[in-house]
């Protein structure tokens, strides 16, 4: 086990246009092969699509989508007596937000559509309306935690 302390959590930097940390977190998850400018253009196009289709502030729609996708509990595998139990554990807000962003992006990648910007915008809109695959993933996680509630004392 490491003798060093845990690393300090660095705050996420805000993005250059909207000055928002959540937007920058999304961009950092979109980046592939170091192409951050492409990730920014994908997200900003998606935000433009959100503005056109919902007539609302895209930042508030993204916040709502992430908030509605954020899980409260998850299951962790714990070995006990030769068998593995799925133990429900509460999730901290930062970890929940990271999971929500990951689920939204994965659901957007799996969609079939024209461009990543279009797929991302439609997934964000669906998540804000509490539909879509990211919300389904959250519900599935909560169902798993509820089903394995009997093992909550194994923490």
Curated annotation (Swiss-Prot):
Pfam families: Ribosomal_S7. Its main location: plastid. It is found in: Plastid, Chloroplast. One of its GO terms (biological process) is translation. One of its GO terms (cellular component) is small ribosomal subunit. PROSITE patterns: RIBOSOMAL_S7 (PS00052). Belongs to the universal ribosomal protein uS7 family. PANTHER family: RIBOSOMAL PROTEIN S7. Part of the 30S ribosomal subunit. Keywords: Chloroplast, Plastid, Ribonucleoprotein, Ribosomal protein, RNA-binding, rRNA-binding. SUPFAM superfamilies: Ribosomal protein S7 (SSF47973). The keyword rRNA-binding applies. One of the primary rRNA binding proteins, it binds directly to 16S rRNA where it nucleates assembly of the head domain of the 30S subunit. GO terms for molecular function: rRNA binding; structural constituent of ribosome. This is Small ribosomal subunit protein uS7c. Gene3D superfamilies: Ribosomal protein S7 domain. It comes from the Eukaryota. The lineage of its organism: Eukaryota, Viridiplantae, Streptophyta, Zygnematophyceae, Zygnematophycidae.
């Amino acid at each position: 086990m490491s003798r060093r302390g845990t690393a300090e959590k660095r705050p996420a930097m805000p993005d250059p246009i909207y000055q928002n940390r959540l937007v920058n977190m999304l961009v950092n998850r979109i980046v592939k092969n170091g192409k951050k400018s492409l990730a920014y253009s994908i997200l900003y196009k998606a935000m433009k699509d959100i503005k056109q289709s919902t007539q609302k502030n895209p930042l508030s729609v993204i916040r709502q989508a992430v908030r509605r996708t954020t899980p409260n509990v998850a299951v962790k595998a714990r070995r006990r007596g030769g068998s593995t139990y799925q133990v429900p554990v509460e999730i901290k807000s930062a970890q929940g937000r990271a999971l929500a962003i990951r689920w939204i992006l994965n659901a957007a990648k799996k969609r079939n559509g024209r461009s990543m910007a279009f797929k991302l915008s439609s997934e964000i809109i669906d998540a804000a309306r509490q539909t879509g695959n990211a919300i389904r993933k959250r519900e599935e996680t909560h169902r798993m935690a509820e089903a394995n509630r009997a093992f909550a004392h194994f923490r």
